[in-house]
Amino acid sequence: MVGETNFGREGRGDGGATVPGGGGNPPGTGPLAGVRVVELAGIGPAPFCGMLLADLGAEVVRVDRPDGAHLIDDGRHDLLGRGKRSVAIDLKDPRGAAAVRDLAATADVLIEGFRPGVAERLGVGPADCAARNPALVYGRMTGWGQDGPLAHTAGHDIGYIAVTGVLHSIGRAGSPPSIPLNLLGDFGGGGMYLAVGVLAALLRVARGGAGQVVDAAIVDGTTHLATFVHAMLAAGRWRDERGANLLDSGAPYYEVYEASDGGYLAVGALEPKFYAEFLRLLGVPPEVGAREPDRWPELRETLAAAFRTRTRDAWATVFADSDACVAPVLSLREAAAHQQLAARRTFVTVDGVQQPAPAPRFAGTPAAMPGRPALRGEHTEEVLLEWGVANTADLLASRVVVQRQEHVGEQVAVDTASR
């Protein structure tokens, strides 16, 4: 079975598998085993790309600032740092930049999420690194892209998706746009697209081509994600307004309904045969459930009234194992216990922290469960020596690079730079 092939762990009662922690991934596992990646530390999409590559078996080394801080910096919960090793290097010191170039010289990939021009000013830009490693794939993650009138301005996910038209399209009729967390821009249109670009460029190198720069912009990726909606719009089958279409809460049979206990059910009964099954199980006569658009408001009220007669879980039992396309809306903490996710071990537990398992799954080159997130500077000395960085001892003594050892959860740091 695929789940057993990939994970091979006994499931917990909470729907996850329990595996031991440890910085970095076991060697030689996953389809990207043997691929070396240098990640210049940042937040959001670039670290997510690094996590994806690590989950697939790549050896990922994150370059942290010695005095920097992560959004989540306790050594256990920074899940975007899982499966990576960390080196702490002062990039503002020319000797630190030289150390990063040494790392890049033996790497397959470097990824960074700085504003355009910052990496160049630090001496670790594409030209600096390619001079020693022409096969290097250099991945760049930004919101606006490397060029254009806004390229050098600040921004965040919500602003990037706002100008693409996608944010405008999410929400209910007559209401402001709904904020889809930062999943759509930062991660879907950002880090995921950077990973796709990096993998495509790696394939090119494997076939004898040269390394190259991958310019991944959240505005580009988010726009690309919306290709289907643009196709519907061009075909005259989509109205450029919220809550008026088949898939945006306009249609009452693609909607979320409240149950008697305040829980919710998600309905996606689009196809006629699935819709007929949905009406039967809900107890709504077919003639009452007619789907013509001019009857949508009346139909929505009918369906809402029916759902209010039972609790969320009672309705989930009614629709279980059917083709009605109805599912309970679960919270983040409830999700791991869902029978399908539990059966597939979609969640795992590492060092006591429940988290999503790597995806997708590979029958021939299964990925190992991720190691715990690296502490800042935890692997500085071992990585620099292992990767052949010149003058490692001098760099440690001068504090250009810092080796730190911490007990996870206790945050007791031992600075070994002066050993």
Please identify what each model-predicted range represents.
Residues 1-67, 132, 137-139, 224-419:
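Acyl-CoA thioester-binding alpha/beta core of soluble enzymes
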Residues 25, 52, 56, 106, ...:
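Active-site-adjacent "lid/gating" segments in soluble enzymes
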Residues 38, 79-131:
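A structured beta-alpha segment of the ubiquitous adenosine-cofactor-binding alpha/beta core
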Residues 42, 91, 115-116, 142-143, ...:
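Short glycine-/small-residue-rich Rossmann-like dinucleotide-binding loops
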Residues 46, 96, 118-120, 146, ...:
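Short glycine-rich, flexible loops that bind phosphorylated cofactors or substrates
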Residues 55-87:
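Glycine-rich phosphate-binding loop and adjoining beta1-alpha1-beta2 segment
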